[in-house]
Amino acid sequence: SDVCSSDLLIVDAAQTAGSQPIDVQALGIDVLCFTGHKALLGPQGTGGLYVRPGLSIQPLVVGGSGVHSFDEQHPAQMPTALEAGTLNVPGLAGLCAGVEWILAQGVETLCAKETALAALFYKNIRDLPNVKIYGDPEMALHAPIISLNIGDEDSARIADILWEDYSICVRAESS
C-alpha cells in the first residue's frame, strides 16, 4: 500500500473471497469487491463491497431503497447509501448461511484442503499427453485453480467426463 499511498487500492476478490484469508488492513485494501455465488457459497445475484472506514464513495445508482422508500433523499449512511432497489433478502440469507458454514469450518482449513486437492489434481495430469497447463504449478502462489487444455478437445466434453467419471466439477470455457 506504500507504493500507491495516494491512490485507492481496489481489489477484485471474486475468486478468493471465502477460499483464501484476506486481511484488508494488513494488505492496505481500500475497497474489496466480491461475488457471493462462488467460494462464499451464496446464491447467484449476491455479492458485496467492503469500503474502508472513513472512505467516502458515491453510489452509481440511487432510489428505491427498501429501507427508506418514502424519504425524498437517498440515505447517506453506509451501507444503505449504496443500496438501490429492494434488497435481495432471500439471497442475502443464503449468502449469510454460506459465510457461517465457511467460518465454522475455518477459511484456513478450507484453503489448505482446496490447495491439497488442486496439487493432487495437478500431479496426476501434468505428464499426460496433450495436456497444456497454464500458470504457475506452485499452488501456494495462487488460488487453487488450474487452467488447462487437452489437445483440441472441446472443454465442455472434458468437463462432462471429469464430472461423470471422477466427480470433479469444473467450469468449461471456450476460447
Task: Map each language-model feature to its residues.
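Short acidic loop-to-helix transition motifs that present clustered carboxylates
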Residues: 15-18, 175
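Short, small-residue-biased leader/transition segments that mark boundaries at the very start
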Residues: 2-5
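Active-site PLP attachment segment
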Residues: 27-71
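Buried hydrophobic positions in well-ordered alpha/beta secondary-structure cores of metabolic enzymes
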Residues: 12-13, 32, 49, 95, ...
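Conserved PLP-binding catalytic core of the aspartate aminotransferase-like
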Residues: 115, 119, 128-174
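A short glycine-threonine-serine/GTX helix/turn-capping micro-motif
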Residues: 76-89, 106
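Structural detector of well-ordered beta-strand residues that form the stable sheet scaffold
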Residues: 10-12, 33, 58, 134, ...
